[in-house]
């Protein structure tokens, strides 16, 4: 049985700012772009969250909810430095580390001899060490199943941890909402609910053939996750190459104005996801994807140095006009391709 830990730093960017400037500690603060530039919130501290300020929220909306919000532009070198220190702490316990972003990672401690091999104690010690050496708090999930570790790390935030033992997995899954499973969005959740499927326990009673017919290969993933099956390794060689976000509509759209409105809603989430792995927003390419009512899809992208909404909208409009051919559109997606480390190093040296 594996021992998987998911460590997630608490409001990481904001926490670094509060650590370095204690005057910010008890007031609402957020990291993000200015209202004038139509920016979005990258992260907010807990005092700001009490007012409803959330990640990926337009800055203008955040300031309406919390007029006295202190908005900071971000110090990404400081965040990267802290992230590297945290990664070094992880490496004291295991070499099997899969970073998901600057502020979260999976650790496989199955073979670790630290803390007498107790994953629970290892997670506690890692969190204590992070606080001792960086004055930052982290939350953790400890489970034998990879995807459950990420869910568990959110259960006792902030500055806590949640353990699901092998004996507890089955009972935990019985009542786990399907919307908690990675990949289950609002549209999929609505389709599942229409089938009477709301929890993993419900899916356990469902015929796999029905799920495959309705959802294709994702139906199998859904069935496996609901059984507590996740055989993916914690991949220490994992190098993220792209970041994307997409939306499948409940009904096909036929007008450009509808597509543009969807892009406006998707863009802040793309920006938030990119900021977690690439705070400076430097990229190699960006592009759009459209899937039509006949299930054919098209992607168009081009070289672009930094995430840019206006360019994405222009690319989408060109794709809409030239490739739709009167068909309805059932999915709209935005994505960026990240710079490979060698290319990024050359770019930095060139600057």
Swiss-Prot record:
Keyword Transferase found = yes
- Give GO terms for biological process: DNA-templated DNA replication; error-prone translesion synthesis; SOS response
- One Pfam entry for this protein is IMS_HHH_1
Give the EC number(s) listed in the UniProt record.
Answer: 2.7.7.7
Cofactor binding note of this UniProt entry: Binds 2 magnesium ions per subunit.
Q: Which UniProt keywords apply?
A: Cytoplasm, DNA damage, DNA repair, DNA replication, DNA-binding, DNA-directed DNA polymerase, Magnesium, Metal-binding, Mutator protein, Nucleotidyltransferase, Transferase
Source organism, top-level taxon: Bacteria
Provide the primary localization: cytoplasm
Could you tell me where this protein is found in the cell?
Cytoplasm
Needed cofactors, names only, are:
Mg(2+)
Report the catalytic activity.
DNA(n) + a 2'-deoxyribonucleoside 5'-triphosphate = DNA(n+1) + diphosphate
The Gene Ontology CC terms held by the record are: cytosol
A GO term, aspect molecular function = damaged DNA binding
UmuC domain residues:
4-185
Q: Name the HAMAP family on file.
A: DNApol_IV (MF_01113)
Instruction: Write the protein's name.
Output: DNA polymerase IV
Q: Which organism is it from?
A: Escherichia coli O157:H7
List the lineage, top down: Bacteria, Pseudomonadati, Pseudomonadota, Gammaproteobacteria, Enterobacterales
Recorded name of the encoding gene: dinB
